[in-house]
Amino acid sequence: MLCLIRLLYWTDWGDPAKIERANMDGSDRKILISGVHLEWPVDLAIDYTTRKLYWIDAKLKVIKHCDLDGSRVREVVNRGIKDPSAVTLFEDHMYWIDEKKIYKANKFTGKNVTVLVKDAFSPKDLHIYHPQRQPQGKRSEDRFQNAIKTTIN
């Protein structure tokens, strides 16, 4: 979810597989990625700073990214991936789960791959909690107060 611009992203494993996006109210639904770039998209991650959408493809065994509108698709990691299940991002790094390991690499180049955890017990998902991962926007209360002020004036 990209709350600041009110967009929702999701994967569809249908035939053909695709990554889609829509407004939070369901309107303006668009297919962003389909065809040769996609087989089994298992997880998505949004990089708020570079405005990129990352995904793992379990069949193609790659991690790719694109601009938030689906343009400029690029492979970031395409070697050594066996059974990926989750991806997340923080600062200049991406982190992903593959089999029972958690990996880290440069999110721009895919280089400097490091194993952070070698024998995790059945990891399924991966999250990083940090204030930088929570983009600041107008709070609902602020919008509500501004609406009241506008109505009263």
Name each model-derived stretch.
Residues 23-27, 67-71, 106-110:
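Short loop/turn segments that connect beta-strands within beta-propeller blades
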Residues 13-14, 49, 58, 99, ...:
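Short loop/turn segments immediately following the C-termini of beta-strands
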Residues 32-37, 76-80, 116-120:
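Surface loop/turn motifs at the tips and blade-to-blade linkers of beta-strand repeat domains
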Residues 4, 15, 40, 59, ...:
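Beta-rich catalytic cores
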Residues 4-6, 49-51, 91-92, 131:
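Short coil/turn segments that connect the beta-strands within blades of beta-propeller domains
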Residues 9-11, 54-55, 96-98, 104:
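Residue position within the beta-strands of beta-propeller blades
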Residues 1, 44-46, 86-87, 126-127:
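Hydrophobic core register within WD40 beta-propeller blades
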Residues 90-93, 97-148:
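Blade-level signature of beta-propeller repeat domains, shared across WD40, Kelch, NHL, RCC1
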